[in-house]
Every structure is written in structure tokens, then in C-alpha cells.
Amino acid sequence: MLGGPSLRKRSAALINDDLLIDLGPDIMSASHMHGCSLDDVRYCLQTHPHADHLDLSHLLSRSPDYGVVGAPVLNVYASRETSERAAETFERDLAGYSLLSPEAEKRLSFKMHQIQPLKPFMVGPYSVMAFPANHAPGMGAMLYSIEANGRAIFYGTDTATLFEQTWQAFREHKMRFDAVILDHTYGPEQPGGDHLNAHQVIEHADRMRAEGVLGPHGRVFATHIAHEGNPAHPDLAAFAKEHGYEVAYDGLVLTT
């Protein structure tokens, strides 16, 4: 089946209109296609610096050179490794100055916050914790839990099998999620690697239910669906339904 939910852009998520997860290359086209304004975004949690998750030209377009005046500050949160790699790329390929410099903060109305894993921090009204992703060694890739107003989600891409320290943190902080979003790069017949496959998603969902990490009415969604062994959306959605999870698609909206 061509088009519809089988036609996918690169992964990102928007929470409550003001919190973006990943400054990816497709966020502007997705915003226009789905009628989802990004005008109110004040915060961004960056998972890692791979090009399908971070397009630094979005930041350059905030400068006065592009006619932008009086833009509200965009606060970006990332690991030290991710922020330093982003700064190096931005200076070398785009702007000639470091993304971590006072000049960048002033010209781009932007601030980079370096975060550490397994230590809670506040992002505006959101309580957030970062977890080391099993992905892209040396790049400080992170997964995130986000809680506000008594509701919590876990955003788990990109990653292979979750580290045991992540499960331990879930227990120590008594985390219980209303929604879990997991990497599903590989399909049912493909082995996992630096990402999860379908059967590993099932294993993670089952363990989350067994350990009480997923709330009694919690839902598990697959995202980051690649071409490697994943069928068209209707077939994959049917497979997922049989195994206790759901398949996300571009433009999906979750409400409480």
C-alpha cells in the first residue's frame, strides 16, 4: 500500500505544543502537512546527533540573517557529547561560530543545556530524566521520561535493548508510564542490532507490564519504523495488535 500511514518521515514528537523531541530534518514539513504549529515550542530534548534526528539548519534559520526578530528563547537539552558534536558541525558546516558560544545564544535566541543521565531535571513545567541509550557509542545518545500534571511518558528511540541501569532507575524512582514509545527499526523477521526489532519491542512491552512500569491503562507505541523487514502499516498494525502494542504513524495525536 502506497501513501497513508505507510508513508513515513523521520521520527520526532511534540508534547503540549511547547516541548519538542528531536530537532529533526522533517519537522517543518510535518508541521505544515498536519496543521501542527511549532510557534509555541520553547524546549527541545535532543536524543542524539545523527542526521535523521538533528538538522542544525533549523537553528541557523532563527538568525537575523533570515529576517527573524524577537524570537523567544529556544532551550535545547542534550548530553555533553551530543551538544559538542552539534557545536562542531554547526561551526564547520553552517555558521563559522560555535553553537555553544555567547554569539550563538544572542544571534539564534537559543540556549544549550548539557544534561547528565539518570539525574532528574526540570524543563519548564516538565520533570524529565535522561537514560543512556544502547545506541551510537560515544555520542551520548539519550532516551527520556517526561512527567507533568500526573501523566508520564517514556520516549525510547533510538536504542537497542535497554540497559539494566535503565530498568533499575524505573524501579528506584517508582516510574509508571501512561505511554511508552519504543524504537521499532527492524521488522519481525530481522535481527536487532543497534536498534530494536519487532520481537524485542514485544519483550520490552511484556517486561514493562510485568514490572509495573506501564500503567494499568498504559499503551505501547512503536516508532522509528524503517524499511528493514517492516511491512506496510496495515499489516504491521495487525501484527502489533496481536502482540499487545500499537504502531505510531505520522500525524498521530494522543490525548489524555
Predicted regions and their residues:
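Active-site neighborhood of phospho(di)ester-bond hydrolases with catalytic His/Asp-centered motifs
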Residues: 20-24, 41-52, 77-79, 154-159, ...
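Alpha-helix termini
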Residues: 35-36, 62-72, 93-103, 172-175, ...
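Core dinuclear metal-dependent hydrolase active-site scaffold
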Residues: 1-36, 111-168, 252-256
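Residue-level recognition of the N-termini of beta-strands and the immediately preceding loop/turn
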Residues: 41-42, 72-75, 105-110, 177-178, ...
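Short, aromatic/basic amphipathic alpha-helical patches
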Residues: 88-102, 232-244
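Cap/insert and terminal regions of metallo-dependent hydrolase folds
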Residues: 160-252
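Short, well-ordered amphipathic alpha-helices
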Residues: 28-32, 57-64, 86-95, 199-209
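Active-site metal-binding motif and surrounding structural segment of the metallo-beta-lactamase
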Residues: 18, 24-77, 177-180
